[in-house]
């Protein structure tokens, strides 16, 4: 992976050519250069410290640009920083910011803006869903600040001068640069946020440093962007304006696409239409294998899911192959582990032994566990599956509920509960659920982005899973001196999570979507499937 090329045993400044959309010579561009994309939901917020999902990151990456970013294939590229270096122990990282980078109000983008933003992220007063991210990266004092033991000003970041941003970590973190692409580490216009508080995200107040500006927002309908002429690389940008729609229903998404109302669907096509779409729209169906896991989170602190045998029974009696092959059938692969084994340094993670056992044997053991817990046909285990409103999630939930009932001979009785995106996120975070549909996509291509999720003190850990041995295994990954040592620690942590049955992993994601043939610059090869408008262009059609 690209980030291996970034690290040196000596302090070495690394520079990259500026990222830009590549338009082949002789290409006839469309005059309008406007694109309509379905974003899949109404975002929680335009504040990157108040969000945690894909609809939100899709918006954030247009309006704001971090230290580093990525190209259309997911390869690391310079962003607000034009170069960086690290000390031999991988514990001090120095980023040199572009002196021509400006906020959309004309102010320069400085190291002070990054210091302000990163401190705000870990400040308990912010209550950021991703507060733990800087703790994951081992930034000095991050966890103590989150826990209220130290002040945000004590975070291990500094503005050495206006254009030099320095990060100090307590342990070696050789993948620091890769992790800096994440939405939670985007800079904020410190003067604007300090003056306006939470109102800074309103359309009339929004100031960003990204390739686009916020032009309009109609809640639950659309978000409109316009090109930012003050963006440092605006001369290489082609798309002039864009509209993101908030269509949650995949069938409606496809219908609007076929009617010509949008140029790119959200990720996730209706399974029953997939083969037909491949046949009727050759070249327009993209299927991107991503670093993501679809699972059912179990509320580990809520009875009866605080009983490991109940969690085990649910894992045993769910046939993942039925969901991937018969319900979805778009290239998803069944999994019984949370961390994708194909992510960097995840290669030592093994699927559990029961994944290879016949379903009849697994079902028999699940029934025994449920009966021992006091359940029967007359007194079945009853719970609800919470999912965000989406017909594909509903199909998976119906299949899971049916399998759990049939495979345990009526010892499980499941109801379905759907909520719109923002309410669903709030319910999971507040622990108002039994079992919840969950999807986790890599924040960067390295196994810690999954392993850290289930740390006892993780702000992302909505399953409320906690095991000191798991925490210890993840700590060992930071103490490891090489990639193989880290890989062993990740495998150990995953094995502990598996023996605790803390979650029900179901499949590894693919992102199927439709893209009009006149939309260029989308490769379908980015393992995180980020959408950057600055990477796209429209040809004459």
Swiss-Prot record:
<dbReference type="Pfam" id="PF00496">
    <property type="entry name" value="SBP_bac_5"/>
</dbReference>
<dbReference type="GO" id="GO:0015031">
    <property type="term" value="P:protein transport"/>
</dbReference>
<dbReference type="GO" id="GO:0030288">
    <property type="term" value="C:outer membrane-bounded periplasmic space"/>
</dbReference>
<keyword id="KW-0571">Peptide transport</keyword>
<dbReference type="GO" id="GO:1904680">
    <property type="term" value="F:peptide transmembrane transporter activity"/>
</dbReference>
<keyword id="KW-0732">Signal</keyword>
<feature type="signal peptide">
    <location>
        <begin position="1"/>
        <end position="20"/>
    </location>
</feature>
<comment type="similarity">
    <text>Belongs to the bacterial solute-binding protein 5 family.</text>
</comment>
<keyword id="KW-0574">Periplasm</keyword>
<keyword id="KW-0653">Protein transport</keyword>
<dbReference type="InterPro" id="IPR000914">
    <property type="entry name" value="SBP_5_dom"/>
</dbReference>
<comment type="function">
    <text>Part of the ABC transporter complex OppABCDF involved in the uptake of oligopeptides. Plays an important nutritional role. Binds peptides containing from two to five amino acid residues.</text>
</comment>
<dbReference type="InterPro" id="IPR030678">
    <property type="entry name" value="Peptide/Ni-bd"/>
</dbReference>
<dbReference type="GO" id="GO:0043190">
    <property type="term" value="C:ATP-binding cassette (ABC) transporter complex"/>
</dbReference>
<protein>
    <recommendedName>
        <fullName>Periplasmic oligopeptide-binding protein OppA</fullName>
    </recommendedName>
</protein>
<comment type="subunit">
    <text>The complex is composed of two ATP-binding proteins (OppD and OppF), two transmembrane proteins (OppB and OppC) and a solute-binding protein (OppA).</text>
</comment>
<dbReference type="InterPro" id="IPR039424">
    <property type="entry name" value="SBP_5"/>
</dbReference>
<keyword id="KW-0813">Transport</keyword>
<dbReference type="InterPro" id="IPR023765">
    <property type="entry name" value="SBP_5_CS"/>
</dbReference>
<dbReference type="GO" id="GO:0015833">
    <property type="term" value="P:peptide transport"/>
</dbReference>
């Amino acid at each position: 992976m690209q980030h291996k090329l970034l690290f040196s045993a000596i302090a070495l400044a690394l520079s990259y050519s500026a990222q830009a959309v590549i338009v082949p010579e002789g290409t006839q561009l469309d005059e309008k250069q406007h694109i309509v994309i379905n974003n899949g939901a109404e975002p929680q917020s335009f504040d990157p410290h108040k969000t945690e999902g894909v609809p939100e990151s899709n918006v954030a990456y247009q309006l704001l640009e971090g230290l580093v970013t990525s190209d259309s294939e997911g390869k690391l590229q310079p962003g607000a920083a034009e170069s960086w270096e690290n000390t031999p122990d991988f514990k001090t990282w120095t980023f040199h910011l572009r002196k021509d980078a400006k906020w959309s109000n004309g102010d320069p983008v400085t190291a002070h803006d990054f210091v302000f933003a990163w401190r705000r992220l870990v400040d308990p007063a912010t209550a950021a869903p991703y507060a733990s991210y800087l703790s994951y990266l081992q930034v000095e004092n991050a966890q103590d600040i989150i826990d209220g033991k130290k002040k945000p000003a004590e975070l291990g970041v500094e503005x050495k001068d206006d254009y030099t941003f320095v990060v100090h970590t307590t342990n070696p973190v050789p993948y620091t640069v890769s992790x800096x692409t994440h939405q939670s580490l985007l800079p904020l216009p410190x003067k604007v946020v300090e003056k306006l508080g939470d109102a800074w995200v309103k359309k009339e107040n929004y100031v960003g440093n990204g390739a686009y500006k916020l032009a309009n927002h109609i809640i639950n309908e659309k978000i409109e962007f316009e090109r930012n002429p003050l963006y440092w690389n605006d001369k290489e940008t082609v798309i002039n304006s864009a509209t993101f729609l908030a269509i949650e229903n995949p069938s409606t998404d496809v219908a609007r696409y076929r009617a010509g109302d949008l140029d790119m669907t959200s990720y996730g096509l209706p399974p029953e239409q997939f083969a037909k779409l491949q046949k009727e729209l050759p070249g327009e169906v993209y299927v991107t294998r991503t670093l993501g896991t679809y699972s059912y989170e179990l509320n580990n602190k809520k009875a009866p899911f605080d009983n490991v045998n109940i969690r085990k029974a649910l894992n045993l009696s769910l046939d993942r192959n039925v969901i991937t092959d018969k319900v979805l059938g778009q290239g998803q692969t069944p999994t019984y582990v949370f961390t994708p084994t194909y992510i960097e340094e995840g290669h030592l993670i093994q699927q559990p032994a029961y994944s290879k056992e016949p379903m009849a044997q697994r079902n028999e053991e699940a029934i025994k566990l449920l009966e021992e817990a006091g359940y029967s046909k007359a007194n079945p285990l009853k719970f609800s599956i919470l999912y965000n409103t989406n017909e594909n999630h509903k199909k998976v939930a119906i299949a899971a509920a049916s399998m759990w009932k049939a495979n345990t001979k009526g010892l499980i009785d499941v109801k379905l509960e759907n909520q719109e995106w923002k309410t669903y996120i709030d319910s999971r975070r507040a622990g108002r659920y039994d079992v919840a549909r969950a999807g986790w996509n890599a924040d960067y291509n390295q196994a810690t982005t999954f392993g850290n999720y289930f740390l006892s003190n993780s702000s992302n850990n909505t399953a409320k899973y906690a095991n000191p041995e798991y925490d210890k295994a993840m700590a060992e990954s930071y103490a490891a001196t090489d990639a193989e040592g880290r890989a062993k620690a990740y495998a150990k942590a995953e094995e502990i999570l598996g023996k605790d049955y803390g979650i029900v992993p179901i499949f590894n994601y693919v992102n199927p979507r439709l893209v009009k043939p006149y939309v260029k610059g989308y490769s379908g090869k980015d393992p995180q499937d980020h959408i950057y408008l600055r990477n796209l262009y429209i040809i004459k059609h």
